[in-house]
From Swiss-Prot:
This is Protein nucleotidyltransferase YdiU. Its EC number is 2.7.7.-, 2.7.7.108. The keyword Membrane does not apply. The gene is ydiU. InterPro entries: adnlytase_SelO, SelO. It comes from Escherichia coli O9:H4 (strain HS). The active site is at D246.
Length: 478
């Protein structure tokens, strides 16, 4: 089958990119590809059998027109000016059978005009982390970019130490970022901001294109998508780590996996990025940061959208987030109805977990085994203060009984929203260390496991992290 590519970005937004081709690595070789995703995108299996090829930037497919995008942004709350694709190249936009498109973005593809002081490369460590994280999030049901392939090489790339150079093929319906809009707003080119908005509406919100109120309705939906995404992050214990405005997806996708982390111990102020000295991007601050970022996006639209309309959309953020978060947390607790004491029960559980540094994922998974008429629970052994747990658990079981639902029905619901497996940093690190020694077995094994996060397991993927894995420090270097 021949793949079809279109050039919408190149043709419609000529001042937002520089056209250039990838720079291949030395002795590049394909070490992993996403068979399921490739099948979904109708990619011929033969493309994965002829060396690095397009996956390593050594060849382009017919119709591809590679380019690096320019954007700007606020980093850690400070205006950083022009940024852009410093090591990534958008190879093309694949036209799918249903008329939608999928960006093929090659990360680690070499120097671009936006590389600044960087070398345009990515290392094997970071490409493995992003591939694992994006696929883990996808199978958790959270909107995200996807990973299609990883190529490693003999080219050394220097970070804290010399590491193998690598490339990741990332795919997404769009790589539109808040930072694209900021770039032209701060250059006082508001007409180009409007062109970006028109491009987004034309291709991703086409049902609004002929509405005279299209910009307000479109921005309201961007706010809603962002609020929904952040709510989902919070419910699974995901910390992004670097929520700069240039890392915010207009479509509400999880974008740019760097120093991310899933909670091990329940620690509301968890900071996964060791460069985040002030805790701006801590786990519990993510909802506030996302709103701040939306306010920066709204500012770029203010030359052609009424400020009252923008503020009205921003004002809806908290309620949308709380609604999504509340619905999912009630499901995680097994509540079939909404009762006034639900928030208090949840907050008391969180307080107990924080005091005891309970494992976030294991706690909710084990809670899924609760029988409403039995005081026995395997979760009890996870707590030192048994009396405090017993008190909470008795009131929790009383709440379950109000719903008049069988244990089996409720347990089935809870196990469908409380994963047994999340991508803990130590699991990724183990796969990385093996891959750096040339053994890809654990990389493939972990990828396969992450496809079924809600299935029961009895292996070390669902055990508590070892001592060495609890406080792994992760940086932005990639």
């Amino acid at each position: 089958m021949t793949l079809s590519f279109v050039t919408r970005w190149r043709d419609e937004l000529p001042e937002t990119y520089t056209a250039l081709s990838p720079t291949p690595l030395n002795n590049a070789r394909l070490i992993w590809h996403n068979t399921e995703l490739a099948n979904t995108l109708s990619i011929p299996s033969s493309l994965f059998k002829n060396g690095a090829g397009v996956w390593g930037g050594e060849a382009l497919l017919p119709g591809m027109s590679p380019l690096a995008q320019v954007y700007s942004g606020h980093q850690f709350g400070v205006w950083a000016g022009q940024l852009g694709d410093g090591r990534g190249i958008l190879l093309g936009e694949q036209l799918l059978a249903d008329g939608t498109t999928m960006d093929w973005h090659l990360k680690g593809a070499g120097l671009t005009p936006y590389s600044r002081m960087g070398d345009g490369r990515a290392v094997l460590r970071s490409t493995i982390r992003e591939s694992l994280a994006s696929e883990a999030m996808h199978y958790l049901g959270i909107p995200t970019t996807r990973a299609l392939s990883i190529v490693t090489s003999d080219s050394p790339v220097y970070r804290e130490t010399a590491e193998p150079g690598a490339m990741l093929m990332r795919v997404a319906p769009s790589h539109l970022r808040f930072g694209h809009f900021e770039h032209f707003y701060y250059r006082r080119e508001s007409e180009k901001v409007r062109q970006l908005a028109d491009f987004a509406i034309r291709h991703y919100w086409s049902h609004l294109e002929d509405d005279e109120d299209k910009y307000r309705l479109w921005f309201s939906d961007v706010v809603a998508r962002t609020a929904s995404l952040i709510a989902q992050w919070q419910t699974v214990g995901f910390a992004h780590g670097v929520m700069n405005t240039d890392n915010m997806s207009l479509l509400g996708l999880t974008l740019d996996y760097g120093p991310f982390g899933f909670l091990d111990d329940y620690e509301p102020g968890f900071i996964c990025n060791h460069s985040d000295h002030q805790g701006r991007y801590s786990f519990d601050n993510q909802p506030a940061v996302a709103l701040w970022n939306l306010q920066r996006l709204a500012q770029t639209l203010s030359p052609f959208v009424a400020v009252d309309a923008l503020n009205e959309a921003l004002d809806s953020y908290q309620q949308v987030l709380l609604t999504h978060y509340g619905e999912r947390m009630r499901q995680k607790l097994g509540f079939m109805t909404e009762q006034k004491e639900d928030n208090a029960l949840l907050n008391e559980l969180f307080s107990l977990m924080a005091r005891e540094r309970s494992d976030y994922t294991r706690t909710f998974r084990m809670l899924s085994l609760t029988e409403q008429h039995s005081a026995a629970s395997p979760l009890r052994d996870e707590f030192i203060d048994r009396a405090a747990f017993d008190d909470w658990f008795a009131r929790y079981r009383g709440r379950l009984q109000q719903d008049e639902v069988s244990d089996s029905e409720r347990q089935q619901l809870m196990q469908s929203v409380n994963p047994a497996l999340v991508l803990r940093n130590w699991l990724a690190q183990r796969a990385i260390e093996a891959a750096e020694k040339g053994d890809m077995t654990e990389l493939h094994r972990l990828h396969e496991a992450l496809r079924n996060p809600f299935s029961d397991r009895d292996d070390d993927y669902v055990s508590r992290p070892p001592d060495w894995g609890k406080r792994l420090e992760v940086s932005c270097s990639s």
